[in-house]
A protein has these predicted regions:
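Metal- or metallocofactor-binding catalytic centers and their adjacent structured scaffolds
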Residues: 338-373
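Basic, low-complexity terminal or inter-domain segments flanking catalytic cores
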Residues: 2-25, 29-31, 35, 40-41, ...
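Conserved short loop/turn motifs at secondary-structure junctions
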Residues: 122, 202-203, 279-283, 364-373, ...
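Alpha-helical scaffold elements adjacent to nucleotide-binding pockets in ATP/GTP-utilizing enzyme cores
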Residues: 136-140, 186, 209-217, 237-241, ...
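C-terminal or mid-to-C-terminal helical accessory/interaction module adjacent to the motor/catalytic core
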Residues: 233-315, 365
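Intrinsically disordered, low-complexity regulatory segments
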Residues: 2, 109-260, 269, 330, ...
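Core structural elements
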Residues: 259-269, 287, 315-319, 367-379, ...
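Short acidic, hydrophobic short linear motifs in intrinsically disordered regions
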Residues: 359-362, 370-384, 411-420, 574-586, ...
Length: 843
């Protein structure tokens, strides 16, 4: 809006001219030769003033134009001043050029005013969560929009107090997050001058809550059409979103607030109890405590497990012409084989060796393996853990980068994948049409199913978003490879391949199952399969590794010769510890939390010292067991899997408008508060048992104790805080130090990475990342070392620098085979991309 001016533009211009005239008068005083020029100057100035006044009347409509005219007038007066000085000492003819300058300025003022007016025109403000996303979206929306980032949440419950008024229907007390003050001021300023404001936070409950908080801060009515969402950051999706704004969904906001307040109730009320009874710095949480319980329960199963002995009996058989194949004993006297001792097995083997062998039955069939669904958040985290070795946190961080936009050269920032927090396997019609066209063009009609593959939604799928997929299948990994980091490329390739494979035909195998009779009592079985048609496996190799197992052509009734029997002893194994993938899968199956929360939950329980990672598996610490046992005894509901799952269901119902938020909070809070009071009285102060070592602290003489850190156990002085001495727990490798003859021990870096050094450090500074081996070099007798490359290759080599002995490790052959397959696959993909490009060019 134009603002009122105390002085009109004409008046200001006139004052500027008069000031210039005064200056000129001073410059020519005492010089008679210039008096005539000085006397004529006011007449010239009047015409300049008239012209300037005429110009400024055109720009009277806006404050921006007025300021442009002011600037122009000031420049004009300055030029006239200079011109006047020059004419005062030169010829009067110079005055003509001086009087022409305002006329030349006329068009300049018009252009400047028009340009300024264009710049200052009100724009539509779009608020997103991150700067990377803002940059990408601004490119798609154009100059009529300004896109700003809120940097996530701007308001939250206070850290210094409970922040929930229980007596007033659980009213939350929200405050602006510390450090966000300047950002809030800037957003308010932008919103004030904007023609419209659209809140474009993420399309989930958390994003809906952020939009609701933004509406409060910016003074926007949440019932207005101020909310826009998009599942992918592409030009069509963004432009479609701004055409269809809608009011903020209060039910989804309530669901997020209920979750936040439940977590605050448990964390704020229960954590101080752990501080008082066990030690400071601990925490409890509605989801984290259940996660710790799962890990502790699994460890208890492992500890209680008693291995049982059992035996299998394999055999080598051959046809008359000498073609051998393997089989395994399956049944004895019509019952499943069950051998539990060497004596029992030896007797059976002795009896079998006397029997005649023949083919009893041959079954041939075609087996199909269907492709898997495109990624959800959970399945992406699991696959990235299994195939790429990524933690859930790292997976989500990289996926966020791919979603928000990556610079693709001249194309600028491009969002490469759809929204990465989803539990849906649904694909849009547009995406299905695009990928089906790509499959047919790149692989042929045999790889394209007659109809799109539709996958059943999970029982908890909200189906608000699509599955995780590339925003365009044409952005094949090899085409964007040079713009991505190594980690971005690996995850993007996984997402792209899974999406394309999900819309391809099944893989087809020819399978053969053979039953072999050994006398009347024994039946052995052999099976083989060959890949007949790769189907989706041409793009995406899933976790089921099937090797071609070939059997000779066999006929029912055909006689066979026994080459040898192969009895083998086994022992049953305990259930494995959870790794990242299996833990995420279990949490999802049991409806504990939501996939988007798994990464921060895992990081929290590691940071608190409740669990540690050992060889990529989670192992509970003594502290984890202690806290879990206490919560199990006094707060059964908090660590009960079923109770936590039911709470999740009720949160879903709040989002659907079926359950009132305050009813849920009240039903949880009242019994929890009562249990908390009883537990506080009943639980005495708990002492964490410490494992005392035989290592003496050299600073104070006490026996050091074993402590659990984030990256494993270490020794610490029990005299803390008076004595702060700590030491790593050293693992002897059994290899002598080549420098001083001491022992080489395994140590841990601050990040938990293993390295090797002399036990006499710092007197001896021998150190290496490579693992010393007890094996001796076959050439010189020195101990061997093992170097492991990033690509997985292993190189055993001699520690004697003068000896050049290198030994190839068996694993390297497998790596080479895998690499060859990968190269062949890449070549095939490149050829397919080239073919698709040629087809596109032909169109």
């Amino acid at each position: 809006m134009p603002t009122a001016q105390k002085k009109t533009p004409q008046k200001k211009n006139r004052e500027a001219v008069e000031q210039a005239e005064k200056n000129e008068g001073k410059a020519v005083a005492g010089k008679g030769a210039a008096k005539t020029a000085a006397a004529k100057r006011p007449a010239a100035k009047k015409s300049a003033v008239k012209k300037t006044a005429a110009k400024t009347s055109v720009v009277k409509k806006s404050a921006a134009e007025t300021s442009a005219a002011k600037e122009s007038a000031a420049k004009t007066s300055a030029e006239e001043k200079t011109a006047g000085k020059k004419t005062a000492v030169k010829k009067p003819a110079a005055k003509k050029s001086a009087t022409k300058k305002p006329a030349a300025k006329k068009t300049a003022v018009k252009k400047t005013a028009a340009k300024t007016a264009k710049k200052e025109a009100p724009k539509t403000l779009v608020v997103v969560e991150s700067p990377a996303k803002a940059k990408t979206i601004e490119k798609y929306l154009g100059k009529k929009y300004m896109v700003r980032a809120s940097m996530g949440h701007l308001r939250d419950l206070p850290k210094s107090q409970f922040g929930i008024d229980v007596e007033n229907d659980f009213a939350p007390k929200y405050i602006n997050i510390r450090g966000k003050g300047d950002l809030i001021k800037a957003l308010k300023k932008d919103a004030k001058h904007a023609s419209k404001v659209y809140l474009a936070s993420d399309p989930d409950r958390e994003g809906e809550a952020i939009a609701w908080h933004l509406a409060h801060i910016l003074g926007i009515n949440p019932d207005e059409n101020c909310r826009i969402v998009f599942n992918e950051i592409t030009k069509p999706a963004i432009q479609a979103a701004v055409k269809e704004p809608y009011p903020i969904n209060i039910d989804r906001v309530d669901a997020q607030q209920a979750r936040r307040m439940l977590d605050r109730i448990v964390g704020y009320k229960l954590s101080p109890l752990l501080w008082r009874k066990i030690k400071k710095g601990l925490s409890a949480g509605r989801v984290q405590s259940v996660t710790v319980k799962l890990i502790c329960d699994r460890e208890k199963e492992i500890q209680a497990f008693v291995p049982e002995e059992y035996w299998t009996v394999g055999m080598k058989l051959k046809k008359e012409r000498g073609v051998q194949f393997a089989a395994e004993l399956a049944t004895v006297d019509g019952k499943k084989l069950a051998l539990h001792s060497k004596e029992e097995t030896s007797a059976l083997v002795k009896d079998m060796a006397k029997q005649s062998f023949s083919v009893k039955e041959v079954k041939k069939r075609e087996r199909r393996r269907n492709p898997v669904a495109p990624f959800t958040t959970s399945s992406m985290q699991q696959d990235a853990s299994r195939k790429l070795g990524f933690t859930s946190r790292r997976t989500m961080m990289i996926a966020q980068q791919l979603y928000e936009g990556v610079e693709l050269g001249r194309r600028g920032p491009v969002g490469l994948i759809t929204y990465m927090r989803t539990d849906s396997t649904r694909l849009s019609d547009l995406a299905l049409d695009e990928v089906r066209g790509y499959v047919e063009a790149s692989f042929g009609a045999d790889y394209l199913p007659e109809k799109p593959n539709i996958y059943a939604a999970g029982k908890k799928a909200q189906d608000a978003h699509e599955a995780i997929r590339p925003t365009s299948v044409e952005n094949a990994p090899e085409l964007v490879e040079k713009y991505l980091t190594r980690e971005q490329l690996r995850l993007y390739t996984l997402i792209w391949q899974r999406f394309v494979a999900s819309q391809m035909t099944p893989a087809v195998f020819d399978t053969v199952s053979v039953s072999v009779a050994a006398g009347e009592r024994y039946i052995a079985r052999a099976s083989g399969s060959t890949l007949k048609f790769p189907g989706f496996l041409a793009v995406y190799a899933d976790n089921k590794k099937e090797k071609d197992v070939l059997l000779p052509e066999l006929l029912a009734g055909e006689a066979l010769s026994l080459v040898r029997l192969l009895p083998e002893q086994h022992f049953t194994e305990p259930p494995p510890r959870y790794n990242e993938a299996s833990l995420v899968k279990t949490l999802e199956e049991k409806d504990i939390g939501r996939p988007s929360t798994y990464a921060p939950i895992i990081e929290t329980i590691l940071a608190r010292g409740y669990v540690v990672r050992q060889d990529k598996h989670f192992q509970p610490t003594d502290l984890g067991f202690l806290v879990d046992d206490m919560l199990e005894e006094y707060f059964k509901d908090i660590v009960d899997v079923q109770f936590t799952a039911e709470l999740e269901n009720e949160l879903d119902e709040i989002a659907e408008g079926k359950v009132d938020k305050n009813d849920l909070l009240r039903s949880f809070y009242e019994p929890f508060e009562e249990t908390l009071e009883k537990a506080d009285e009943a639980i005495g102060e708990v002492e964490i048992p410490e494992e005392v070592s035989d290592v003496v602290c050299e600073k104070c003489g006490r026996n050091m104790v074993v402590k659990q850190g984030r990256y494993g156990k270490f020794l610490a002085c029990p005299g803390f805080p008076d004595c702060r001495n700590t030491k790593p727990i050293l693992k002897d490798t059994g290899v002598p130090c080549p420098k001083c003859g001491g022992r080489i021990v395994e140590r841990r870096s601050r990040r938990g990475q293993a390295f090797y050094g002399c036990e006499n450090y710092p007197a001896c500074d021998y150190v290496t990342w490579d693992q010393p081996l007890t094996e001796k070099c076959p050439e010189c007798g020195a101990f061997m070392m093992r170097h492991r490359y990033k690509n997985g290759r292993v190189l055993p080599y001699c520690s004697n620098e003068a000896c050049k002995t290198r030994i190839d490790h068996p694993i390297n052959k497998e790596i080479e085979k895998s690499r060859a397959r990968l190269e062949a696959k890449k070549a095939k993909e490149a050829a397919a991309a080239e073919k698709a490009a040629e087809a596109e060019a032909g169109k």
